[in-house]
Amino acid sequence: NEYEDLKIIVRKKGEMKTLYVQDFNEKQKYLVGEYDLEILTFPRINLSDIKISQSHTTTIQFQNPGVLNLSFPGSAYASLYLEKDNELKWLKDFNPNLTRYKIVMQPGRYRIIYRSINAKKSIYTEEKRFEIKSGASTNINF
């Protein structure tokens, strides 16, 4: 399971102070009230106003991840972006000295912008769009 070490940060509604860091499959009792959750997936999932009722189990569900297998031919400058609502949200810069990555990611549309470390002009910049699907692997090679 890609999420066996997944953590969830639990906070009282509207507060930034961490109340508890819960393991993904752990059952935990909370006082009746509303909570905000930050699920430490990639990219992160933020859920607000989760209601906890007395004598009731509240289950949080979200899509299973996919896996990105990424390969660069050599040292490169590259960044990963999430495509959402016709906008790009920066997620990660890749280490220019690493050429292979395996990243567990939430389903969605993404883009990688890449340029070889030896290319000195922006005309040599490459861009690849791809989709991560739940339960599937996506291979991207530059």
Question: Language-model segments: which ranges?
Answer:
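Hydrophobic beta-strand residues in large extracellular and virion-surface proteins
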Residues: 8-10, 35-37, 50, 60, ...
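A short, amphipathic beta-strand motif
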Residues: 1-2, 66-74
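Short Pro-Gly-centered beta-turn/loop motif in secreted/extracellular proteins
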Residues: 22-44, 97-120
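Structured interaction patches on ligand/partner-binding surfaces of diverse proteins
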Residues: 42-64, 117-142
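Generic "edge-of-domain/loop-turn" microfeature
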Residues: 15-17, 35, 44-46, 57, ...
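Extended non-catalytic domains of envelope/secretory-pathway proteins
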Residues: 6-8, 14, 21-23, 27-44, ...
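Short, solvent-exposed S/T- and G/P-enriched segments that are highly enriched in secreted/extracellular
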Residues: 14-28, 87-103, 126
